[in-house]
């Protein structure tokens, strides 16, 4: 199938004519600067609908392509067990394992390829082979340190319930620090915790330094110092954490309805426009906005409950509450 590129057109009629010609030839792929762009409204909100085999603009509804190929497997699976059994490839490459997941391991089950039990003498041989394989997977001290650091990263991330993309990001940052020799003179646990904190901020999955310090074996001050150092050396550009980023998590832990969450975000957006969030701890401002929104909605939570979830004091919530209600003219009846 020929692929034609549609450049940006000033005349809307010219665009329509070109689009109709391409639809007739069944070769519509709209692209600009390596990104899919709608030729009708210049939107980049393009949806690939594999069920209908279409590429559609989310904003104006223009169908850019109606014969999209499905590049997935030819087999179907209805549960995880079937998916594992029918898959003909191994696990994807990952930065969270020291060898990037490219090595293989001897299965712990003492069964052959037909599912039959292995004899006792073969079982002893397999035990020795497994032991030696574990040893040779880590060839030198640097690999051993990397394996330990990545396991520490995974341990902290598991305790904090962080998603896969944050773990991958943290592993990439830690590997970058190793390549630049930033680990020398610093604890492996400290650099791992700092990389995880940076990854959380980069992926918009906010966690405070206190939360990470609580789950790691390093104190808050060392994590903060190491984070600033590796951010400077690796040239990581991170915007300040917004209080809005904390609202979904706090609201979920408090079991508040979606209306309260939306109202809290609206309050914080207005507060940001008036400069009320700058220079203040994002968790405290987010907690105060959630408290105000819960009172306005009628699903009231106590200041103590909100403070415990946000990890701040009741005094902080009261101070931020007073600032928000006064400057935003919010009438709250307690």
Curated annotation (Swiss-Prot):
Q: What keywords tag this UniProt record?
A: Metal-binding, Repeat, Transcription, Transcription regulation, Zinc, Zinc-finger
Query: Residues that bind Zn(2+), according to the entry?
Result: 38, 41, 57, 60
Q: Which InterPro entries match?
A: Cyclin-like_dom, Cyclin-like_sf, TFIIB, TFIIB_arc, TFIIB_CS, TFIIB_cyclin, Znf_TFIIB
Signal peptide, first to last residue: none
- A molecular function (GO) term: DNA-binding transcription factor activity
| One GO CC term on file | transcription preinitiation complex
Q: Zinc finger regions (TFIIB-type), where?
A: 34-65
Which residue ranges contain the repeat sequence?
151-234, 245-326
Could you give a single Gene Ontology term from the biological process aspect? transcription preinitiation complex assembly
The answer, when asked if Transcription is one of the entry's keywords, is yes
State the protein's purpose: Stabilizes TBP binding to an archaeal box-A promoter. Also responsible for recruiting RNA polymerase II to the pre-initiation complex (DNA-TBP-TFIIB).
**Which family would the database say this protein is a member of?**
Belongs to the TFIIB family.
* Name used for this protein in its record: Transcription initiation factor IIB
The taxonomy runs: Archaea, Methanobacteriati, Methanobacteriota, Methanomada group, Methanococci
């Amino acid at each position: 199938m020929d692929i034609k590129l549609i450049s940006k057109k000033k005349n809307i009629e010219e665009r329509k004519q070109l689009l109709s010609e391409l639809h007739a030839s069944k070769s519509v792929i709209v692209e600009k600067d390596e990104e899919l762009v709608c030729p009708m409204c210049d939107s980049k909100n393009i949806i690939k609908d594999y069920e209908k085999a279409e590429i559609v603009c989310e904003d104006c509804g223009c169908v850019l392509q109606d014969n999209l190929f499905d590049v997935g497997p030819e087999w179907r699976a209805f549960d995880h067990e079937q998916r594992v059994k029918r898959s003909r490839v191994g696990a994807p490459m990952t930065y969270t394992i020291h060898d990037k997941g490219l090595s293989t391991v001897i299965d712990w089950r003492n069964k052959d390829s037909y599912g039959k039990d292995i004899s006792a003498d073969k079982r002893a041989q397999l035990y020795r082979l497994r032991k030696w394989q574990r040893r040779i997977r880590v060839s030198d001290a640097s690999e051993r340190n990397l394996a330990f650091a990545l396991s520490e990263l995974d341990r902290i991330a598991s305790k904090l319930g962080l998603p896969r993309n944050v773990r991958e990001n943290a592993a990439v940052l830690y590997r970058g620090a190793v390549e630049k020799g930033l680990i020398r003179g610093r604890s492996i646990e400290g650099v791992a915790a700092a990389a995880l904190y940076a990854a959380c901020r980069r992926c918009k999955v906010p966690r405070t330094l206190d939360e990470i310090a609580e789950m790691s074996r390093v104190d808050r001050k060392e994590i903060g110092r190491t984070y600033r150092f590796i951010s400077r050396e690796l040239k990581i550009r991170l915007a300040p954490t917004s209080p809005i980023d904390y609202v979904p998590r706090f609201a979920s832990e408090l079991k508040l309805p979606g209306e309260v969450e939306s109202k809290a975000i609206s309050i914080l957006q207005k507060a940001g426009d008036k400069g009320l969030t700058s220079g203040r701890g994002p968790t405290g401002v987010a907690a105060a906005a959630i408290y105000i929104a819960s009172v306005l909605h009628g699903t009231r939570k106590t200041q103590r409950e909100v403070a415990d979830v946000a990890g701040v004091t009741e005094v902080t919530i009261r101070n931020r509450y007073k600032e928000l209600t006064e400057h935003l003219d919010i009438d709250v009846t307690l």
